[in-house]
Amino acid sequence: MPFLSTAHLCALLLILGCFYIGRLIKVIPILRFACAGEAEIKPLFIQPKSNDGIHLFVFLGSGGHTGEMLRLLQNHQEVLLNKRNTFYIGYSDDDSKARFLSMVEKYDFKAERIHFYPFAKAREVNAGPIASIVTISKTLLTGFTNVLSIKMNTLGQPHLTLLNGPGTCCIINFWLKLLEWLIYIPYLSNGSNVVYIESLARIESLSLTGKILYLLADVFVVQWEELKVRKAPRSEYYGILV
């Protein structure tokens, strides 16, 4: 006699299917928005419930994107640059890493509280279709190990992910959401907490990365009110942040 009859197996698959469909709705913000019919009101940054600080994953996307992210960190340093925080800094060029280190020198962080993760660029400027496919594939593969490491280190801890700008953010968000969907541990699995901040330069339309992460980021932030009204009703507007 088989361990599970066909009826039992079908019932088990049905239960698992319903569970993961429910998880998918919970994990993908645009699905929650579609089901609820209105945007969730969320604070911009998570507030730690203890004195241990938060685990903060920040991606520096090079050039102007890095500049905006560093200004964001400094403008909200009480929460984001708290000495009790643990930092996971993703970067795609050495200059961005150096700029971050230069910025945090005055805050006297302990070295063990800052962890760096190099990410390959998802797409180079003016790259052709074939070159883009190659770089995206490379970023998918190498990015997974970084995201998995960060995910496991922040499991069960108050944490926040800050993204802005480049296409690599889409890959980071993809892996975070996939792992959140697949890995469910009661009392430890507490979401990805991804905040995506659209560039200050985006006044009338979303960037390509923004259009993708509008569907996937837990909190999607625009810095111009007319952009929220015209193009991104699910987004949050807190004024100019950078």
UniProtKB/Swiss-Prot annotation:
Its main location: endoplasmic reticulum. GO terms for biological process: dolichol-linked oligosaccharide biosynthetic process. It is a single-pass membrane protein. InterPro entries: Oligosacch_biosynth_Alg14 (IPR013969). The keyword Lyase does not apply. One of its GO terms (molecular function) is protein-membrane adaptor activity. One of its GO terms (cellular component) is UDP-N-acetylglucosamine transferase complex. The chain crosses the membrane at residues 7-24. It is found in: Endoplasmic reticulum membrane; Nucleus membrane. Residues 25-242 are cytoplasmic. Gene3D superfamilies: Glycogen Phosphorylase B. Keywords: Endoplasmic reticulum, Membrane, Nucleus, Transmembrane, Transmembrane helix. Residues 1-6 are lumenal. Heterodimer with ALG13 to form a functional enzyme. Involved in protein N-glycosylation. Essential for the second step of the dolichol-linked oligosaccharide pathway. Anchors the catalytic subunit ALG13 to the ER. Belongs to the ALG14 family. This is UDP-N-acetylglucosamine transferase subunit ALG14.
